[in-house]
Amino acid sequence: MRDFQSRFADRYNQITNSYSYSSSRQGLITGMVNVGSFFGCLLSSPVADKIGKRLSIIVWTTVYLIGIIIQVTTVPSWVQILVAKIWTGLSIGALSVITPGYQSEVAPAIMRGAIVTTYQLFITLGIFIAACINMGTHKYSHGTTAQWRISIGINLLWGIITLVGIIFLPESPRYLIAIGKDDEALKIMCYNNDLPLEHEIIQTEYHTIKSDCDAELAGGPARWPEIFNANIRYRTFLGMAVMMFQQLTGANYYFYYGTQVFRGTGMDSPYLAALIPDAVNCGCTFGAIFVLEFFGRRSPLIVGGIWQYICFFIYAAVGDRALYHKNGTSNHRAGAVMIVFSCLFIFSFSQTWAPAAYVIVGESYPVRYRSKCAAVATSANWFWNFLISFFTPFITNSIGFKYGYIFASCNLTGAAIIFLFVHETKGRTLEEINTMYASNLKPWMPHPEGYREFGREQNNATLKSHIGLNGETTELIENTDNQGDSGSFQTSTPDDSRPEQNQASATYIRPDKREPRL
């Protein structure tokens, strides 16, 4: 957009009467929002733990609105744009952690995966709407700030919708139980599930959350160094790796620099060319809801990584070898091939890596560490997002479309990481997931039924310890000693001669509790 360039670009060509950016300024303007998002992720955990996720969303949305206002009112100072982007990024990063967590805690268990996937769906919808707005405003007459102020200012609408909408939504039941408001939490759970209080689903979920909160209260809030202790370190680094490779798939190479990328393919309207993959991205994300619920998490990530490797390799090869004729003109057929494989890449990404990475992170951590581990994992995502957005202009100026070979190899590596290290979490309870990661089972090996049964026994024992079974109390006792490679489940019956110990107890002796070392 010429008016935006005339205000913030650092290069002017008198011959062509055009403005352009140096690689450093373009990288900074594009990438500084990710710097703010990185720190916003880390700030999200203490704020949410203190005031709850619902109120946190209100606070961070207000921060977001202030950042947009600063951008819209910018005078010809690119430094103000950078500061405003960092400020806005703080809220975006925090909300990228809090919002999926809020969704997973409020949603009925049977719909949890699908509802969390809508987070990514609305991200893609926002990208598509932004592309449409850019398409409509870039032809505004030169000299008017409407070209870019409308594109930025429209974001105020989404912030206001979020701010008003969250007022009518309930607080997370988990947070309410943690602060002792159990009755209010139960009312919300009954309303969200459309079930009566005495229903087994409500009682099971309530007592599971209650036991989790009691355990967290007994151990105290997790401190940041604890997420790198031996018992959780494996999953902490694994979550960071999954979110890192979500960025290294190269999707944002298209979304950030789509107009520049497709201008090189010979398209007359680069804005229209960039709109095509955005539309594919938005439309195909609807399929992710069914893909993740039907095929799980591991398989879509592995297949998606391989698919995306093939697409990026062909894209890079055509761009490097066939896009330009010897006289320097564009080969439009080669350009069309590149756009097709860009769309095929996004078709896969929008249904696999885009939503599944967030679902994996949301399902993999024990309750006590969840908020901090999710914050660190998501901050890794924003950190690599910044590196890609900042260095892409330098790299493309140096090696052109060969850049795609790097992303192709990263897609293949990401698929290998998922195959080797990530367990399937679909349909498993938190206790089952903890058991899988604490055992020596390999993710690609069949899981013995005993490990799933142990997770169920833990849930049942937790429930019985609260509501009683035939007038008695059942208590689960976990043996923390290493008992070898196999596990067993032992029970003891009440001793009538000792009334003070007249309770049933169950002890599960399981494999090595330590998580695999990286």
From Swiss-Prot:
Gene3D superfamilies: MFS general substrate transporter like domains. It is a multi-pass membrane protein. It holds the Pfam family Sugar_tr. Residues 477-506 have a biased composition (Polar residues). Residues 49-54, 99-112, 171-236, 293-298, 355-374, 424-518 are extracellular. GO terms for molecular function: carbohydrate:proton symporter activity; hexose transmembrane transporter activity. The keyword Metal-binding does not apply. GO terms for biological process: carbohydrate transport; hexose transmembrane transport. NCBIfam families: SP. Belongs to the major facilitator superfamily. Sugar transporter (TC 2.A.1.1) family. This is Probable high-affinity hexose transporter ght7. It comes from Schizosaccharomyces pombe (strain 972 / ATCC 24843) (Fission yeast). The lineage of its organism: Eukaryota, Fungi, Dikarya, Ascomycota, Taphrinomycotina.
